[in-house]
Regions:
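Short acidic-aromatic low-complexity motifs
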Residues: 36-41
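N-terminal G-site of the GST-like fold
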Residues: 57-76
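Vicinal oxygen chelate
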Residues: 5-11, 15-25, 29, 35, ...
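Acidic/polar active-site rim loop that often engages polyanionic ligands
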Residues: 104
């Protein structure tokens, strides 16, 4: 299955890439996702597979220091997880303190070099989810679509190919 290279990932929290900023420093803004019902491990593994990333740091709730007590039924949940990409990372955790409300107005944007790779990622993320804008050509791109995946994360998937 063609996957293409991820050019950049955007979210309300920032851009998933390294940028040089004034003064010569570099920065990296990374979306951080919260999952209810202990679904972080499953979701992040799915995203790593679909978006051709690699699972990085994983911290289980059971490994938290004693000053951070965790309910017994949540010890298998994740306190932190990372999916690494060449230019950044996607991070997440389970909502250990209680249910997390979805962010209003926030989406994770992934832009691929090719329409084929973008459409493939869109269709795989859509499994068990709901399309809010079907993947199709637009006036700015050969392919773009929006969806909420089965974990409740809202995605915008596009490509660099001209319409």
């Amino acid at each position: 299955m063609p996957r293409g290279n991820i050019r950049h990932v955007l979210s309300a929290q920032g851009v998933l890439c390294s940028n040089q900023i004034k003064g010569g420093s570099t920065m990296q803004l990374s979306p951080y996702l919260f999952f209810n019902e202990g679904l972080c491990r499953e979701a992040m593994t799915t995203y790593a597979e679909i978006l051709a990333g690699e699972l990085g740091m994983i911290v289980e709730a059971a490994d938290m220091p004693p000053e951070f007590p965790i309910d017994e039924d949540k010890k298998g949940w994740l306190a932190h997880c990372e999916v690494n990409f060449p230019n950044g990372k996607l991070m997440g955790s389970d909502s250990l303190a209680g249910p997390s409300e979805p962010m209003a107005g926030a989406n994770v944007m992934v832009n691929f070099e090719s329409r084929e790779a973008a459409e493939s990622a869109f269709n795989r993320l859509l499994e068990g989810g709901e399309a809010t804008m079907p993947f199709a050509p637009t006036f700015w791109s050969a392919g773009f679509g929006m969806l909420a995946d089965r974990y409740g994360v809202r995605w915008m998937i596009g490509c660099d190919e001209a319409p």
